[in-house]
């Protein structure tokens, strides 16, 4: 598989099946390869965290194909906060949104009262979220302390057959992972 290929209909269908069955996928994002799964499946999220050697307390990002997929998080927020988030999407900006009704499980949110959310404009990320019908967990594809994978061979080197499916595609044009902005305070973390 070459990084420049796009996933076929069959590859997307298999990725969908993997995610819905509780598996873990690797896929290209705007800047680096990501690991993803069903955010409502605790075992799948915990497995990703185990692979990465990442503590649950840190939380992970949710990526979505559209604002509608994360509307449940936006609706309880004031109009001004919603507008600020919408100003950044779709695109390579991750917004920290208050999870005021605690709708996102603690294994995704971590120790935080906010949830990191990105409505992506990357075609593979969007296709995966559309195929599964939900936002997905997204975290960089690397063990803690190592550089994120920027090629399929690095994904395989880091995790071998411990990932259920690798979805082919090209990285987006960004050199760095997405910016992270607290949408209420405006503070930028990355």
Curated annotation (Swiss-Prot):
Catalytic activity: L-threonine + hydrogencarbonate + ATP = L-threonylcarbamoyladenylate + diphosphate + H2O
InterPro entries: DHBP_synth_RibB-like_a/b_dom (IPR017945), Sua5-like_dom (IPR006070), TC-AMP_synthase (IPR023535), TC-AMP_synthase_SUA5 (IPR050156)
Listed GO biological process terms: regulation of translational fidelity; tRNA threonylcarbamoyladenosine modification
Location relative to the cell: Cytoplasm
EC number: 2.7.7.87
Domain of life (superkingdom): Bacteria
UniProt GO molecular function: ATP binding; double-stranded RNA binding; L-threonylcarbamoyladenylate synthase; tRNA binding
YrdC-like domain mapped to chain residues: 9-190
Keywords assigned by UniProt, alphabetized: ATP-binding, Cytoplasm, Nucleotide-binding, Nucleotidyltransferase, Transferase, tRNA processing
Any GO CC annotation of this UniProt entry: cytoplasm
Pfam families: Sua5_yciO_yrdC
Predominant location: cytoplasm
Protein family per UniProt: Belongs to the SUA5 family. TsaC subfamily.
Function recorded in the entry: Required for the formation of a threonylcarbamoyl group on adenosine at position 37 (t(6)A37) in tRNAs that read codons beginning with adenine. Catalyzes the conversion of L-threonine, HCO(3)(-)/CO(2) and ATP to give threonylcarbamoyl-AMP (TC-AMP) as the acyladenylate intermediate, with the release of diphosphate.
Listed name of the protein: Threonylcarbamoyl-AMP synthase
Native organism: Marinobacter nauticus (strain ATCC 700491 / DSM 11845 / VT8)
Gene name per UniProt: tsaC
